C-alpha cells in the first residue's frame, strides 16, 4: 500500500465490518475510493468474543477492497464502540506566567501538560483529552484564553476512556492479518464529526447511531463534544424480538426493513404478510400490526436509554437542533 496516498479506516461492528479507503488528491484532501461492508461474526455488543471469527470477517472486507483497488492494506485507523467506552471530566488550573501581558500559548500548553499527566484507572486507557472551556480568574469563561488578562487559568477537560481488553483484542485481530493500527477512536465521536453540520455542533445536537449491537450517543454544544455514551442494545435486539413471532433468523431483517414500523398505531390493523418458513412450501402469516408492536416496544426501550444519557450529559436543555439519527439498522 502506498502510505503517502491512501487512508484506510476499519469499523468493526456487531453485525458488519466496514472498510473504507480514501486517496489524497493533489491538494491533500481525502477522496473516498472504496467502501466495503461484510457481515461480521465474533462480536457481541462491540466486544470481540471470538478472535478467529473476527479476523476472518475483517479479512474478507480487507481483501475485497484490496482486489478492487489493487493494493495490499498493511495499516489502518480503527473505530471502537461498546459500553466499555465512556467519558469523564477533570478540572485543573495553572497560574499565568505574565499576568500584565495576558494569557499566552505557554500558559495554555502548561495546562495541557497537567491534563496529559492525568492517569486512567489500571484497566482503562485514555483515548482523547478534549478541552470543554477555559476560565480566567474564575469568572471569565472564554473559548480561546490567549490574550485574556488574569492570574489564574483553569479548564475542564473531557477524557474519553476505553477498557484495555477490547482494544487489545482488536489490535490482536489486526496483527493476525498483518495490519498495523495507526490510531483507535471512539465511534461516537467519529460519527458526530462526520454527520453533524457546523450549525448543529455549535448550537447543540445529539447524534444517535443505532448499530447492530450497540447504540452510540454523542452530545455536541458550542462546537465541542460534551458527552459520549454507548448503550449495549441496537437493531439486533429488535431482530431477536421479531424472532419470537416464529420467524426464522434469515428472514427477520428483510421482514423488518420491508414491512416494519416503529409506530404501531400507523400499522394497518388487519393486513397480513406471508413469510417463508423452513421449507419452500411452508409459510407463516404475520399481522403487520403485531410486527409493529414488537418493534415499537424495543425501539421505546432504546429511546428511553438515549433520553437518559442525554439528561446525564447535562446539556439536554441546550440542544437547539435536537437529536440526529443515523445508522444502518
Roles of regions detected by a PLM:
Residues 203-245:
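Glycine-rich phosphate-binding loop of actin/hexokinase-like ATP-binding domains
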Residues 14, 214-215, 326:
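Ser/Thr-centric signal marking residues that sit
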Residues 1-16, 20-207, 224-226, 235, ...:
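Nucleotide/phosphate-binding catalytic cleft detector across ATP-hydrolyzing
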Residues 240, 289, 293, 297-304, ...:
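Feature representing long, continuous alpha-helical segments
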Residues 80-83, 212, 327-328:
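Core structural elements
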Residues 317, 324-329:
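Nucleotide-binding motor/catalytic cores of P-loop/tubulin-like NTPases across gene-expression machines
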Amino acid at each position: 500500500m502506498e502510505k503517502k496516498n491512501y487512508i484506510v479506516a476499519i469499523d468493526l461492528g456487531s453485525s458488519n465490518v466496514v472498510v473504507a479507503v480514501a486517496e489524497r488528491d493533489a491538494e491533500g484532501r481525502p477522496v473516498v475510493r472504496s467502501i466495503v461492508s461484510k457481515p461480521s461474526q465474533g462480536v457481541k455488543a462491540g466486544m470481540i468474543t471470538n478472535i478467529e471469527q473476527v479476523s476472518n470477517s475483517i479479512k474478507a472486507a480487507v481483501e475485497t477492497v484490496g482486489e478492487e483497488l489493487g493494493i495490499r492494506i498493511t495499516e489502518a485507523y480503527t473505530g471502537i464502540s461498546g459500553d466499555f467506552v465512556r467519558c469523564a471530566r477533570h478540572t485543573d488550573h495553572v497560574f499565568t506566567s505574565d499576568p500584565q501581558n495576558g494569557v499566552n500559548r505557554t500558559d495554555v500548553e502548561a495546562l495541557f501538560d497537567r491534563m496529559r499527566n492525568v492517569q486512567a484507572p489500571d484497566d482503562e486507557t485514555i483515548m482523547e483529552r478534549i478541552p470543554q472551556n477555559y476560565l480566567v480568574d474564575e469568572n471569565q469563561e472564554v473559548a480561546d484564553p490567549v490574550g485574556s488578562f488574569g492570574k489564574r487559568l483553569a479548564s475542564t477537560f473531557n477524557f474519553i476512556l476505553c477498557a484495555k481488553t477490547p482494544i487489545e483484542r482488536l489490535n490482536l485481530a489486526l496483527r493476525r492479518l498483518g495490519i498495523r493500527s495507526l490510531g483507535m477512536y471512539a465511534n461516537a465521536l467519529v460519527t458526530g464529526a462526520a454527520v453533524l453540520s457546523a450549525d448543529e455542533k455549535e448550537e447543540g445536537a445529539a447524534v444517535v447511531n443505532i448499530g447492530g449491537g450497540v447504540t452510540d450517543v454523542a452530545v455536541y454544544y458550542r462546537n465541542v463534544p460534551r458527552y459520549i455514551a454507548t448503550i449495549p442494545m441496537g437493531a439486533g435486539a429488535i431482530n431477536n424480538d421479531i424472532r419470537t413471532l416464529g420467524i426464522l433468523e434469515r428472514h427477520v431483517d428483510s421482514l423488518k426493513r420491508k414491512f416494519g414500523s416503529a409506530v404501531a398505531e400507523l400499522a394497518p390493523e388487519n393486513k397480513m404478510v406471508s413469510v417463508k418458513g423452513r421449507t419452500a412450501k411452508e409459510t407463516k402469516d404475520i399481522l403487520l400490526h403485531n410486527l409493529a408492536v414488537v418493534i415499537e416496544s424495543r425501539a421505546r426501550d432504546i429511546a428511553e436509554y438515549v433520553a437518559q444519557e442525554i439528561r446525564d450529559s447535562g446539556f439536554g436543555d441546550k440542544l437547539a437542533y435536537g437529536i440526529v439519527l443515523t445508522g444502518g439498522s
